[in-house]
A protein has these predicted regions:
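The start of beta-strands in P-loop NTPase/AAA+ ATPase cores
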Residues: 8-10, 119-120
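Short N-terminal binding/cap micro-motifs at the start of the first secondary-structure element
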Residues: 18-23
Length: 177
């Protein structure tokens, strides 16, 4: 199978994989639609060992079948070894940022994995997104990273995926100075 020229490598957070199901609940429906669009448009899912373990523990039945299809079509990228850009050390070095030091390490793997691929994250995490944005300069984030929440607006997210999932067309964690 030949990949589309617009094929991108996207991180799909475990919270999206867990939420995506056949249920007609708005969040489940939104996450499912976005993951189905990734498959149709031949974008690739990026998984590190940490993320794969999280997926195995928390994924829905829909997500399990979706990942099986992605792997079968060779639409997956395994990051090995896991990226380590020093972000975790810089998070723990933040002064006067107790909340940030407590919250950001839980999801720093998403940011590091995105920086090691195409700078694209699908996640429902809004608090940590705000913290990464607030501390982008101190963390020395090298370039903007798209952080897209499928539950915010599924139709817009699906359209974004269908048109090539470009970083510049999404809400982003800014590059640090």
């Amino acid at each position: 199978m030949r990949l589309s020229t617009n094929s991108r490598r996207l991180l799909v957070d475990t919270n999206v994989a867990r939420s995506a199901s056949e249920s007609q609940h708005p969040i489940s429906d939104a996450c499912r639609q976005v993951m189905e669009a990734m498959l149709r448009e031949q974008h690739r899912v990026v998984l590190s060992a940490t993320q794969y373990w999280e997926w195995q523990k928390y994924q829905s039945g829909f997500s399990k079948n979706w990942l099986r299809q992605m792997v079968g079509r060779k639409l997956h990228v395994v990051l090995s070894p896991e990226p380590n850009s020093g972000l975790t050390d810089r998070i723990y070095a933040l002064e006067g940022a107790d909340k940030a030091r407590a919250e950001m390490p839980k999801d720093v793997h998403l940011l590091e994995n995105a920086l090691a691929s195409d700078d694209l994250v699908l996640s429902q995490e809004t608090n940590v997104f705000g913290l990464f944005c607030k501390y982008a300069d101190a963390l020395q984030i090298p370039r903007a990273v798209a952080w897209v929440n499928p539950a915010d607006d599924a139709a817009t997210c699906v359209a974004w995926i269908q048109t090539g999932a470009e970083v510049r067309k999404a809400r982003c964690i800014p590059a640090g100075a």
